[in-house]
């Protein structure tokens, strides 16, 4: 199973707006799997957690933050329970929320939430097979990924992955 979490359409001029935007993004990733709520492979606790993720847009602000922090990890647990396979997580444009937050002045509020959301899913998670993260900004030492192990960073000018993504000199 594969989860795509795209931050491409993130927007938010305030921390409160950013929470609403993250809720829409998480919901967009989870709704494709909504049919799994009735799957007998899910236990009651996973089902209830998954329902919170599916209803994240309508939750009170403080509850939304908690669900956002754990939502990706919950979705991975659900997929692992149903499909009995580790999950591939694709995170597209991870840096868009951080760039918005820095520009609008709420970076220090958003950073810990985004770090918990992504690190919780991508570090020490038995449900993860592989994670691929894309973004325009170079990953700095103090980023949402500082806690991750076995992390590689590649730019478009790197040639080591060129054949795998169709960017060889011949092409």
Please identify what each model-predicted range represents.
Residues 1-171:
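Phosphate-binding site recognition
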